[in-house]
């Protein structure tokens, strides 16, 4: 019996010898990788992904897969600089030569800009070849996506029919009057910052706002007729199956491709796993390395506008969408509408999430309201004519809410006409009007299940925006565009919305100590924490002022009451985070040539990690390690670009301990 058992054991070992050896070998590798991963983690870490300095830590599985299947691109080798102790600037033997070559390069670029018509015929041939190549790549990518998602083709076909009907309504609702541009004088509306504390004699009352854009009776009647038609004919709901799940949408194209990629890189690094769709408006703005190689690895994909709007395999000459020319501000509403997601967070390409926005979809205020908008700096200047056109009753008896940007709150008012003079009340404090302040559309959270019709109406406003609706919303003041259309459409249709009460914060720095503040971006706050903060503040106000102990305990239990909502989005809109352009235009240098932090040293306290350093680390990863090939950097030598990124990274690292 024992001999038989021994024989079987030897037989098993001979037959499975190589499997046994391979198993031991793989086990040793995995144990080594686990040990390496844990030994490289810092002792104290605020997050599994980003630590307090903004350093990205790969997950265990990511470390294993990268070790077993390393990226094909060759890592960029960082050069160790020589440092001048007097000014912390890098110096080298060829520093003078590099300045001369840089000057020559700038002269060549300027000369090239002065001669835009040279080699026109060859450029047109290249453009035609690029068009055909991009079209082929787009179709191949879509076919691949369709194979992985069996119901996608049916969904697209549903969309083609639905959108054609929608654009038929838009076309038939075209205003019969020409552009609205009649003003009594060259004077335009005072573009005032919303400031509750300012001693401003200009009240944006109905009387004041009626002094600018003028409509004749014929124009007013025609606008009312077309608006009524579109409101009565637009559907409330989309076809079943056209939209599903939650996702994030960007509008890219051209120079915005790079900014979108940088934002997506940050989004993934802060732990957001939501799928992403990148809207490409024009075929010449499609970049194969971005759409075919990089984005799929980040669980994102490009969607080409025309192929989502009309069937590319059919003759679309009679399509109603073809009767419109799309550009600029119309892209945002189109991007939301053409995306496959039911619930959408729309982000500008230069808008970078500081933390994961994933929880916003599953909690209030979004779950209850279906639309979340964020405030902008300015007072609302919407013409009283708009409310007449949209058939909105702006009360002369009751007020709606009054906004206080210092406290970050709306106060409900219920004052009857007899106790106030309407000429002394802002129009947009009256019940029924669109509330102050204006909206900032760098981020927008919307449900197409509850707000499809407002979205369609907003698209209508944007299609006829430059000629008709932008003058009604902004009356010729600065900053007119799509930002007013989403909330205006929602108010017009009587849908719910939530406007974040916490006022945006300006982010920037002082180039000269004691000098003027130079704004470089805007910080927008977490709406979930904003709503929680409002509710807790109401509860706190009910605690008797004498009961200090109860007040203290309440604050300890609710940290958000003490700290306030946190910054969720950094809209890095001026200057854009293009590392080479920042250097060329000296945006990251002070008057003496020393490097500066764009958003100042206080960002580490505000965000919880070194946000600015982390963006430049993302640039290094994308451009120097992963070797992303984008048109925006095609005229820049990669080694020069990466040297600049590394030099600025070293500066940012050297200033991480400065927090004031």
From Swiss-Prot:
Keyword annotations from UniProtKB, A to Z: Glycoprotein, Golgi apparatus, Membrane, Signal-anchor, Transferase, Transmembrane, Transmembrane helix
UniProt topological domain (Cytoplasmic) ranges: 1-17
Region Disordered: start-end pairs: 75-125
Pathway as given in its UniProt record: Protein modification; protein glycosylation
Pfam families assigned to the protein according to its UniProt record, in alphabetical order: Mannosyl_trans3
SUPFAM superfamilies, per database record: Nucleotide-diphospho-sugar transferases
GO biological process terms held by the UniProt record: mannan biosynthetic process; protein mannosylation
Extracellular side: 39-660
Segments passing through the bilayer: 18-38
Subcellular location: Golgi apparatus membrane
Membrane topology: Single-pass type II membrane protein
Main location: Golgi
Database matches in InterPro entries: Alpha_mannosyltransferase, Nucleotide-diphossugar_trans
Any single GO CC term annotated in Swiss-Prot or TrEMBL for this entry: Golgi membrane
Positions annotated as glycosylated: 657
GO molecular function list: alpha-1,2-mannosyltransferase activity
EC number, UniProt record: 2.4.1.-
Family: Belongs to the MNN1/MNT family.
Its biological purpose: Alpha-1,2-mannosyltransferase required for cell wall integrity. Responsible for addition of the first alpha-1,2-linked mannose to form the branches on the mannan backbone of oligosaccharides. Addition of alpha-1,2-mannose is required for stabilization of the alpha-1,6-mannose backbone and hence regulates mannan fibril length; and is important for both immune recognition and virulence.
Protein name per Swiss-Prot or TrEMBL: Alpha-1,2-mannosyltransferase MNN21
Source organism (scientific name): Candida albicans (strain SC5314 / ATCC MYA-2876) (Yeast)
């Amino acid at each position: 019996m024992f001999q038989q058992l021994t024989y079987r054991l030897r037989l098993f070992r001979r037959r499975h010898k190589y499997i046994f050896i391979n198993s031991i070998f793989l086990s040793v590798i995995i144990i080594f990788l686990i040990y390496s991963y844990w030994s490289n983690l810092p002792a104290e870490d605020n997050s599994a992904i980003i630590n307090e300095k903004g350093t990205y830590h790969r997950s265990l599985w990511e470390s294993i897969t990268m070790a077993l299947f390393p990226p094909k691109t060759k890592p960029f080798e960082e050069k160790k600089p020589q440092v001048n102790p007097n000014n912390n600037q890098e110096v080298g033997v060829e520093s003078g030569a590099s300045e001369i070559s840089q000057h020559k390069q700038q002269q060549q670029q300027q000369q090239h800009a002065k001669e835009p018509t040279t080699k026109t015929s060859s450029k047109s041939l290249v453009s035609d070849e690029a068009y055909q190549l991009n079209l082929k790549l787009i179709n191949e990518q879509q076919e691949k996506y369709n194979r992985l998602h069996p119901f996608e083709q049916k969904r697209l076909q549903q969309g083609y029919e639905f959108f054609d009907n929608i654009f038929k309504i838009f076309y038939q609702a075209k205003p019969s009057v020409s552009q609205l541009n009649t003003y009594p004088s060259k004077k335009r509306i005072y573009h005032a910052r919303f400031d509750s504390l300012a001693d401003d004699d200009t009240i944006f009352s109905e009387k004041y706002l009626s002094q600018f854009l003028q409509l004749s009776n014929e124009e007013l009647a025609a606008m009312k007729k077309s608006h009524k038609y579109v409101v009565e004919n637009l559907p409330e709901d989309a076809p079943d199956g056209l939209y599903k799940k939650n996702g994030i949408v960007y509008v890219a194209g051209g120079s915005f491709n790079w900014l979108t990629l940088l934002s997506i890189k940050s989004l993934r690094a802060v732990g957001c796993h939501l799928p992403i769709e990148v809207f490409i408006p024009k075929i010449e703005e499609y970049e194969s390395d971005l759409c075919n190689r990089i984005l799929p690895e980040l669980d994102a994909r490009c969607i080409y506008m025309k192929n989502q709007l009309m069937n590319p395999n059919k003759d679309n000459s009679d399509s109603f969408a073809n009767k419109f020319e799309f550009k600029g501000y119309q892209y945002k509403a189109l991007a939301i509408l053409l995306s496959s997601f039911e619930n959408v967070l729309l982000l500008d390409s230069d808008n970078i999430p500081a933390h994961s926005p994933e929880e916003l979809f599953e909690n209030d205020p979004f779950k209850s309201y279906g639309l979340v908008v964020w405030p902008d700096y300015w007072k609302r200047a919407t013409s009283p004519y708009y409310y007449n056109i949209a058939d909105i009753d702006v009360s002369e008896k009751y007020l709606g809410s009054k906004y206080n940007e210092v406290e970050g709150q709306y106060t409900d008012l219920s004052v009857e006409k007899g106790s106030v003079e309407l000429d002394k009340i802002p129009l947009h404090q009256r019940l029924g009007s669109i509330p102050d302040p204006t909206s900032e559309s760098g981020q927008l959270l919307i449900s197409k299940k509850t707000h499809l019709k407002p979205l369609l109406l907003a698209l209508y406003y944007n299609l006829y925006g430059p000629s008709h609706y932008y003058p009604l919303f902004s009356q010729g003041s600065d900053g007119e565009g799509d930002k007013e259309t989403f909330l205006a459409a929602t108010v017009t249709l009587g849908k719910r919305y939530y406007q974040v009460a916490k006022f945006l914060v300006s982010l920037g720095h002082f180039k000269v100590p004691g000098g003027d503040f130079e704004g470089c971006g805007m910080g927008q706050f977490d709406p979930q924490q904003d709503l929680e903060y409002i509710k807790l503040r109401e509860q706190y106000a009910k605690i008797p002022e004498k009961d200090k102990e109860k007040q203290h305990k309440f604050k300890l239990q609710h940290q958000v009451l003490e700290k306030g909502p946190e910054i969720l989005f950094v809209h890095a809109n001026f200057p854009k985070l293009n590392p080479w352009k920042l250097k060329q235009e000296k945006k990251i240098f002070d008057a003496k040539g020393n490097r500066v932090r764009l958003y100042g040293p206080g960002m580490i306290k505000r965000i919880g990690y070194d946000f600015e350093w982390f963006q430049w680390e993302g640039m290094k990863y994308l451009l120097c390690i992963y070797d992303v090939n984008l048109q925006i950097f095609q005229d820049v030598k990669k080694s020069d670009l990466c040297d600049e990124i590394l030099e600025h990274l070293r500066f940012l690292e050297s200033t991480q301990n400065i927090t004031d």
